[in-house]
Amino acid sequence: MMKCVVLVILGLTLLLGTQAMPSSRLSCYRKLLKDRNCHNLPEGRADLKLIDENVQHHFWEGKGCEMICYCNFSELLCCPKDVFFGPKISFVIPCNSH
């Protein structure tokens, strides 16, 4: 009986410990804008590209098309595209990585 209890506790400890370890998955983060203005983005920011003229205040961040930033008043909210739009919608968002 004692052996069974020890095994259950050890199993739960291992299970909870592996879930608590950081994953390599990208997460969301915020960046404050110096001039608190979304209208002049992406001027002066080589790492931001407008997604589409019809989609205001949404930018691709970096060279690829994995992170999307939304300009909201005085900050940029950046998330992986699957988190931002969801996996069913994110694959139809136009990506021009050039």
Curated annotation (Swiss-Prot):
Residues 1-20 form the signal peptide. Glycans are attached at residue 72. The keyword Disulfide bond does not apply. Keywords: Glycoprotein, Secreted, Signal. GO terms for biological process: mesenchymal stem cell proliferation. GO terms for cellular component: cytoplasm; extracellular region; Golgi apparatus; neuron projection terminus. It is found in: Secreted. Belongs to the SCRG1 family. PANTHER family: SCRAPIE-RESPONSIVE PROTEIN 1 (PTHR17463:SF0), SCRAPIE-RESPONSIVE PROTEIN 1 SCRG1 (PTHR17463). This is Scrapie-responsive protein 1. It comes from Rattus norvegicus (Rat).
